[in-house]
């Protein structure tokens, strides 16, 4: 592409099959690169470039590597070269190494990410994030789930809180063997520790429990000469969380989804927040 005011822009796209899928349930491992390069901007005298790249590769049947690197030479690239004005845009890059063993009900991952702010407000970055999840007694009536995460949060603005958040959650569920209604109970205990850079450490502990009743109805109807099976399941649920004081805990990656609850599953989940910096309090 030739711009009379800027110069010649070289563009290229590359896509390669790195490795065939290791199983029918997985996808092929693909390397993808898109780039634009202006050797020397006639106005600024500087090189201007854009690079989008990604690699999704199954190292083994259980181990997967995902890499994304997206970056531009400077914040004015889109306005000057692409002739566009993106709103609230940031370019995200990350590296994720994940392990999943369905037979043992175990999964783990490690992640690091970077964000180049273009026209948005800088957000917290996960400099390093590790997590592990395990289901015990998965073949029993009362499976137990254990989730552990540790995340180091950083921010470009020095006045923003930063530090390491470590969380652990253990939960148990039980579905009683009744055909009607279907009764499911659950209980969980959560602990979170914050090691903050310029503030005292904070530890939060909370426990909760819930019960739900489902009333499944099955019936058959005739639609234009074809029989259709229908299933309607009214549900009634109650969730309780103990009251905890958490106003002093910084918000790294958590939002209140109260006004955005649009599904029945969200409404009955008993969880008001995304992320781990806030837990639902009693009567939230």
Regions found by a protein language model. Give the residues of each.
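Outer-membrane beta-barrel proteins and related beta-barrel translocases across Gram-negative bacteria
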Residues: 1-284
